Amino acid sequence: MDKNTITGLVLIGILLVGFSYLSRPSEEQIAAQKKYYDSIAVVQQQQEALKAKTEAALANENKGAAAAADSSALFFNAMHGTDSKVSIQNSVAEITFTTKGGRVYSAMLKEYKGQDKTNPVVLFDGDDATMSFNFYNKQGAIQTKDYYFEAVNKTDSSVTMRLAADNASYIDFIYTLKPNSYLMNFEIKATGMEGKLASTEYVDIDWTQRARQLEKGFTYENRLSELTYKVKGDNVDNLSAAKDDEKDLGNTAIDWVAFKNQFFSSVFIADQDFNKVSVKSRMEQQGSGYIKDYSAEMSTFFDPSGKQPTEMYFYFGPNHFKTLKALDKGRTEKWELNRLVYLGWPLIRWINQFITINVFDWLSGWGLSMGIVLLILTIMVKVVVYPATWKTYMSSAKMRVLKPKIDEINKKYPKQEDAMKKQQEVMSLYSQYGVSPMGGCLPMLLQFPILMALFMFVPSAIELRQQSFLWADDLSTYDAFITFPFHIPFLGNHLSLFCLLMTVTNILNTKYTMTMQDTGAQPQMAAMKWMMYLMPIMFLFVLNDYPSGLNYYYFVSTLISVGTMILLRKTTDETKLLAILEAKKKDPKQMKKTGFAARLEAMQKQQEQLQQQKQNKR
């Protein structure tokens, strides 16, 4: 910065200070200005006071008008009252009602414990759940949530909540809890209401519930918690469990709507169907104590004359397959609430429904711990699939003893342009020895539905809930033997020991399997090996949040597979096996070319002929 610039800046500064000093207001001007602003403040205060008085007067006037209107309302006497609680119960459940709205206030299940493993499970309590019925008359909608009911005709297992216009005109909500059951009958019946309610034969219903987090693992419970419903005469459907979702079902007839947790559900069932159904599910934040925020709007039949009551049901209970299945006993139209227990795709669901569940219940009846039950069940599955395992192994062993001959073919055709000839000669070799390269695939595919059946069954088995085994204190959720003070992407804030053991045994199984199946005929085998080793590592991240019972099953299953492979290899004399194959080659009568090998060989010959024709044309 030069001298001229500095001088210029100093002069500008002096001018600004001088101008500010010369243009300052005098003391008289300052006093006048203060007086002006003070007068404005006084006026504003007066205006605000007048406005407040006016609003108060209008409010009192509106209140008086509303009171005058309410005094002529149908249920004027029920607009004010005391919010009191009434409970009914049986051996398995206790249901509490509130007189404000005449609705279910809380649902407690006596035979199941909450996360503290001390107090019974409470599905909802207080404002966690709401339900309002909208009736109609000339004055508009009558929303039951705004009125006080009276509890009458109460017994240990039933209560009638009455919304009375007068002694002769009322609407009854009749709740009856069945003995030793989670099912509660719900009946709406009008008395003396003909002409006082609109003649429309329906009632609108608004039902909401914030589903509580009832299990330790938020992520996995959230994955299995979803709003589910059944279309009349059709299948069961649900909203997405992975994101906010909603659906307007229009005039589709619906049998029931369920607000589902992993192991428990609140189900609302219509005897005369629900229609005009709109359902919504919203995700809750982890740590809030809730899993999902559910809501449903629907309509159902209602006779204001009272000649025909509205029949409905509530189910507040466990997602236990046989408990839910038993509710259809004696019914012509099945509810199929057992579909709340997800058992997999149709074939896998069939295996679980008719085989896995019955075998599991039979083993559980011995009084064994659930860890031992899973161990025995896994061994039984391995015994069932052993013939397919043996066939797969023998196919691999045959390929292995023919490896030297395949290596000779590879040396014979080292050039890429001879790949077709090389492949044809390899297939010819397999055909001569009666070996199919796909011989081990079909047995593996036959095992898949059985193995997948347990994968689907274990996470849905409420019998595993809060059952401990070894270091796992609950087989229905993850077993965290290491907890991190931070969150690792895709892994979470813990490490499951059974998941880690499952990963290690899978790596060992992969290593052992790859050494047995290495024919050396394909150069891309190296990349395939890396993929096979990478998959167990991926399983560690995917299954770390899964139930420890599931990871325990996979760990034991893989361990048995490794042991089976070692045993088969030690008991299989590969020299004798090669001699048997050589004998088959020499005796054409013993040869039986497989359909796949024959078709593949024919296709290769046809391809070679086409290539030869192209070369001849050139």
UniProtKB/Swiss-Prot annotation:
The keyword Secreted does not apply. It is found in: Cell membrane. GO terms for cellular component: plasma membrane. Coiled coil: none annotated. Pfam families: 60KD_IMP (PF02096), YidC_periplas (PF14849). CDD domains: 5TM_YidC_Alb3, EcYidC-like_peri. InterPro entries: Membr_insert_YidC, Membr_insert_YidC_N, YidC/ALB3/OXA1/COX18, YidC/Oxa/ALB_C, YidC_ALB_C, YidC_periplasmic_sf. Required for the insertion and/or proper folding and/or complex formation of integral membrane proteins into the membrane. Involved in integration of membrane proteins that insert both dependently and independently of the Sec translocase complex, as well as at least some lipoproteins. Aids folding of multispanning membrane proteins. This is Membrane protein insertase YidC. It comes from Bacteroides thetaiotaomicron (strain ATCC 29148 / DSM 2079 / JCM 5827 / CCUG 10774 / NCTC 10582 / VPI-5482 / E50). The lineage of its organism: Bacteria, Pseudomonadati, Bacteroidota, Bacteroidia, Bacteroidales. The gene is yidC.
